[in-house]
């Protein structure tokens, strides 16, 4: 009997199973890859793009210029741990090949110029600034492109529409209707003015009949033409310049240069690939028809026709939901630093131009033209 008690049957023991333990269905992704990959893009491609945007920097007469070549980073002075201990920034020197070209004599001088110490990203996706570890947070911003929206006017209870052409870099172009059934344009968030003023200034159409043929004969177009103070291309350019740069003496050449620089200069205006894609899709272009990174005259015409179609209630014209994630994009650390670096470069560009005009051509060297303080200051502002 004792032996029977000791050898209890195995069926009496419970079979325990844990449902808390489940096998991994997928590997955990690298959650900081968006940070490290974006900064690697900036070091390899973003910096080169920023330098290309300002090349070449010419003097007033155009007989001398400065060009930027390859860039490279040196070795950091301290390791990440040493920077934390010494309360210093984890950074490396940036060197750029700069060429000075005298077009009159054909002389070319090339030097590798130190452009300042640049903060580096650690393997953890962070920056060490004065010994403190910091993270740059990505931004959720409006995607470049053209967007149409509507709202109710509080006084008249009319539906008014607006169109915003948002670039990745450059001036905004906005069209809007109002309770008086007028179509206005706002350039770079300045005072609004009749939209037909821009049509004439760009040379898209000049006479009343040409504008009606271009935009249609709706009541809105006719009312806007009646409010337009200009009747020729030259008058429109002067009017635009006076409203955009009040206090400065307007000339036709300066007005034309201003308008071209705002929307048609790749160095100052960039829709980016996503902006061009979204604009083409909204306005009915095919990629073969329009692949420009800047605005085109046809972009402006079709945008105006679209907002007129919305106001008239025509079929097939719909507004956009700007809060929809399809109309948003993530601006990562590499792009944020690139934008700040561009600000420093544009400040330095002015200094280089001034020095080219002041120094004797024989004495000019790339090192003597470049002042790195604006770039260093811009990067410090960011971090």
Protein language model features and the residues they cover:
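N-terminal non-catalytic structural scaffold regions of very large proteins
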Residues: 1-383
């Amino acid at each position: 009997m004792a032996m029977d008690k000791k050898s209890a049957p195995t069926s009496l023991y419970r079979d325990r199973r844990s449902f808390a333990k489940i096998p991994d269905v997928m590997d955990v992704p690298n959650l900081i890859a968006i940070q490290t990959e974006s900064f690697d893009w900036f070091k390899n491609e973003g910096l080169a793009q920023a330098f290309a945007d300002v090349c070449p920097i010419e003097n007033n007469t155009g007989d001398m210029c400065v060009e930027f070549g390859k860039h490279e980073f040196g070795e950091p002075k301290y390791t990440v741990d040493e920077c934390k201990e010494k309360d210093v920034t984890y950074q490396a020197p940036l060197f750029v090949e700069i060429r000075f070209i005298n077009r009159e004599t054909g002389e070319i001088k090339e030097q590798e110029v130190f452009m300042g110490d640049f903060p580096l990203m650690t393997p953890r996706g962070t920056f060490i600034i004065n010994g403190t570890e910091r993270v740059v947070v990505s931004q959720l911003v409006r995607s470049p492109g053209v967007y149409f929206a509507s709202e109710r006017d509080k006084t008249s209870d009319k539906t008014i529409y607006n169109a915003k052409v948002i670039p990745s870099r450059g001036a905004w172009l906005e069209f809007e209707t109002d309770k008086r059934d007028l179509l206005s344009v706002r350039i770079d968030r300045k005072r609004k003015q009749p939209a037909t003023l821009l049509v004439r200034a760009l040379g898209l159409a000049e006479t009343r009949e040409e504008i009606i043929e271009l935009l249609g004969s709706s009541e809105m177009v006719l009312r806007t033409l009646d409010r337009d103070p200009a009747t020729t291309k030259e008058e429109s350019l002067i009017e635009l310049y006076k409203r955009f740069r009040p206090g400065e003496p307007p000339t036709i050449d300066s007005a034309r240069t201003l308008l071209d620089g705002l929307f048609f200069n790749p160095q100052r205006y960039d829709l980016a690939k996503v902006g061009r894609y979204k604009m083409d899709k909204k306005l009915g272009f095919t990629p073969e028809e329009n692949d420009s990174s800047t605005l085109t005259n046809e972009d402006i015409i079709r945008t105006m026709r679209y907002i007129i179609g919305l106001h008239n209630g025509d079929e097939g014209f719909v507004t956009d939901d700007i809060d929809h994630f399809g109309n948003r994009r993530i601006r990562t650390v590499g792009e944020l630093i690139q934008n700040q670096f561009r600000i420093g470069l544009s400040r330095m560009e002015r200094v280089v131009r001034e020095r080219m005009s002041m120094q004797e051509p024989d004495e000019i060297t790339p090192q003597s033209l470049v002042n790195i303080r604006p770039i260093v200051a811009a990067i410090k502002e960011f971090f």
